Amino acid sequence: MNQSILSPFGNTAEERVLNAINAFKNGTGVLVLDDEDRENEGDLIFPAETITPEQMAKLIRYGSGIVCLCITDERCQQLDLPPMVEHNNSVNKTAFTVTIEAAKGVSTGVSAADRVTTIQTAIADNAVLTDLHRPGHVFPLRAANGGVLTRRGHTEASVDLARLAGFKEAGVICEITNDDGTMARAPEIVEFAKKFGYSVLTIEDLVEYRLAHNI
């Protein structure tokens, strides 16, 4: 990727990652771009621990509509969330589990507030299987152990960023789309970030940062 396009968000990987971590600490979303030879998409990501209905509404409005909760394998086991399919043959091995809904405190489960309730229920320290109904309108994703050093996906990036910011290892993500329904690529993501004041980084930035700091 042409790094000059990212210069407004930091001149180095270190700067961009630190800006993103600070944004997370302040409860603000960040935009993460993956490799051009992978999905070549940008996801808007919020810490699951602090996401608000207003932020969820922005994900729904400007994203693909598939709002995902990225969590660790340990959390999936705690909630007894099996894979969505027995044999995952998707190109990037995206690890969807069965979809979920909070068992209490929601109506249809579709609204921004209901989806936030479902997320907060799922990441609660003492959350158990019976706190959730299946299927639902939130799509959990199981992050690979080792984060972006193991798999260079938005799922792992969101969990890594949450951990680096001092939050529970859980992030909420959605792919950003253009007005015509096509997927937003780097130039559109940069313009979107400037319009709404988001930080931007790449998964490669995060890999470089983790390797440099051995974290």
Swiss-Prot record:
<dbReference type="GO" id="GO:0005829">
    <property type="term" value="C:cytosol"/>
</dbReference>
<feature type="binding site">
    <location>
        <position position="39"/>
    </location>
    <ligand>
        <name>Mg(2+) 2</name>
    </ligand>
</feature>
<keyword id="KW-0479">Metal-binding</keyword>
<comment type="function">
    <text>Catalyzes the conversion of D-ribulose 5-phosphate to formate and 3,4-dihydroxy-2-butanone 4-phosphate.</text>
</comment>
<dbReference type="GO" id="GO:0000287">
    <property type="term" value="F:magnesium ion binding"/>
</dbReference>
<feature type="site" description="Essential for catalytic activity">
    <location>
        <position position="137"/>
    </location>
</feature>
<dbReference type="GO" id="GO:0008686">
    <property type="term" value="F:3,4-dihydroxy-2-butanone-4-phosphate synthase activity"/>
</dbReference>
<feature type="binding site">
    <location>
        <begin position="151"/>
        <end position="155"/>
    </location>
    <ligand>
        <name>D-ribulose 5-phosphate</name>
    </ligand>
</feature>
<feature type="binding site">
    <location>
        <position position="39"/>
    </location>
    <ligand>
        <name>Mg(2+) 1</name>
    </ligand>
</feature>
<comment type="similarity">
    <text>Belongs to the DHBP synthase family.</text>
</comment>
<feature type="binding site">
    <location>
        <position position="154"/>
    </location>
    <ligand>
        <name>Mg(2+) 2</name>
    </ligand>
</feature>
<feature type="binding site">
    <location>
        <position position="175"/>
    </location>
    <ligand>
        <name>D-ribulose 5-phosphate</name>
    </ligand>
</feature>
<keyword id="KW-0460">Magnesium</keyword>
<keyword id="KW-0686">Riboflavin biosynthesis</keyword>
<comment type="subunit">
    <text>Homodimer.</text>
</comment>
<comment type="pathway">
    <text>Cofactor biosynthesis; riboflavin biosynthesis; 2-hydroxy-3-oxobutyl phosphate from D-ribulose 5-phosphate: step 1/1.</text>
</comment>
<dbReference type="Pfam" id="PF00926">
    <property type="entry name" value="DHBP_synthase"/>
</dbReference>
<dbReference type="InterPro" id="IPR000422">
    <property type="entry name" value="DHBP_synthase_RibB"/>
</dbReference>
<dbReference type="InterPro" id="IPR017945">
    <property type="entry name" value="DHBP_synth_RibB-like_a/b_dom"/>
</dbReference>
<keyword id="KW-0456">Lyase</keyword>
<protein>
    <recommendedName>
        <fullName>3,4-dihydroxy-2-butanone 4-phosphate synthase</fullName>
        <ecNumber>4.1.99.12</ecNumber>
    </recommendedName>
</protein>
<feature type="binding site">
    <location>
        <begin position="38"/>
        <end position="39"/>
    </location>
    <ligand>
        <name>D-ribulose 5-phosphate</name>
    </ligand>
</feature>
<keyword id="KW-0464">Manganese</keyword>
<dbReference type="GO" id="GO:0030145">
    <property type="term" value="F:manganese ion binding"/>
</dbReference>
<dbReference type="GO" id="GO:0009231">
    <property type="term" value="P:riboflavin biosynthetic process"/>
</dbReference>
<feature type="site" description="Essential for catalytic activity">
    <location>
        <position position="175"/>
    </location>
</feature>
<feature type="binding site">
    <location>
        <position position="43"/>
    </location>
    <ligand>
        <name>D-ribulose 5-phosphate</name>
    </ligand>
</feature>
